[in-house]
Regions:
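Alpha/beta catalytic barrel-like cores
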Residues: 1-128, 134, 150-153
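Active-site capping/gating regions of soluble enzymes
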Residues: 2-14, 118, 186-251
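Aromatic-enriched hydrophobic runs in primary sequence
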Residues: 30-31, 54-67, 75-77, 136-138, ...
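Well-ordered, non-membrane alpha-helical segments in soluble/globular domains
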Residues: 62-74, 103-116, 141-154, 185-195, ...
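Alpha-helix termini
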Residues: 77-80, 114-122, 149-164, 193-202, ...
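Core alpha/beta catalytic barrel or barrel-like domain that forms the active/cofactor pocket
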Residues: 85-94, 119-136, 158-177, 200-223, ...
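Short, well-ordered, mixed-charge alpha-helical segments that flank or form enzyme active sites
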Residues: 98-99, 138-141, 180-184, 216-220
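Short, well-structured alpha-helical patches and their helix-loop capping segments
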Residues: 106, 132, 136, 140, ...
Length: 251
């Protein structure tokens, strides 16, 4: 198995899950959009999380998150750069389930955030992966990647910036959320690997398939959800060996 050079996050946090008590860092039971910037920073700096999932799909989030993180906590993020040491990963809208204008906004945000990060002295784009919820096919993963490339190239044609000229690709993390889709996750990922090889001439350096737990359990029950998750993990292990592509499932 080839070695992955890119750091792989081992712990992920997301915006204020249900808590029994008010958050210790703000002592409030309701976390506003304005508070979420500090929440992300606390997850990184105090709780030691490697990755923070920023929910562009299901929430109206602060779209200036990268700007505010770098400007408020400049020293920390220059020492622990986003996209290299710490990771902010957008969960973007699935255009097969909802309208695409929020995806367009997310992609423009990702691209322009790279401009900002480089201007602040960072050496890497702050966002290098996005999570695609409700993934059902390899075509959806590849289409999302290609759409980002189109947006990035259009932005470069209009607003030239040498620092981010090569930033025109982003990796997509497929979040598979239905039991029936998890049981055939090997087909989804294998089809994607073949598409990727055809498009780029080689296989991806690694993949981070995301296994949902709450939705499968809610829709199909606990036992089917657990069995489907185990099946998906087994599928990914076999695909990793078959194609020599490291798999790092998120669950």
């Amino acid at each position: 198995m080839k070695k992955t050079v890119q750091k792989i996050p081992s712990t992920m946090s997301t915006q204020h899950p249900d808590n029994a008590n008010p958050a210790y860092w703000c002592n409030k039971s309701f976390i506003s959009t304005a508070d979420e910037i500090e929440e992300a920073f606390v997850a990184f700096s105090e709780l030691g999380c490697d990755e923070y999932m920023w929910d562009w799909e299901g929430k109206f989030v602060d779209e200036a998150v990268i700007d505010k993180l770098y400007r408020r906590y400049t020293d920390y993020f220059l020492k622990h750069p986003l996209g290299k040491d710490k990771f902010l990963t957008y969960r973007v809208p699935n255009i097969w389930e909802e309208r695409g204008y929020r995806l367009a906004r997310a992609f423009i945000n990702i691209i322009t955030s790279a401009d900002l990060a480089f201007d602040m002295g960072a050496k890497t784009p702050p966002i290098i992966e996005v999570i695609l919820p409700m993934t059902k096919s390899a075509e959806q993963i590849m289409h999302t990647e290609k759409t980002f490339r189109k947006v990035a190239k259009l932005k470069e044609e209009i607003f030239e910036n040498e620092a981010t000229k090569s930033f025109d690709r982003i990796d997509v993390i497929p979040l598979i959320e239905q039991v029936e889709d998890l049981t055939r996750a090997d087909k989804i990922i294998e089809d994607y690997l073949k598409m990727y090889k055809k498009e780029y001439g080689s296989y991806p350096k690694y993949m981070r398939p995301f296994i949902a737990r709450s939705d499968p359990a809610l829709n199909a029950g606990l036992i089917p959800a657990v069995l489907a998750s185990k099946a998906a993990i087994s599928h990914y292990a076999k695909l990793a060996k078959k194609y020599n592509v490291p798999m790092y499932p998120i669950i």
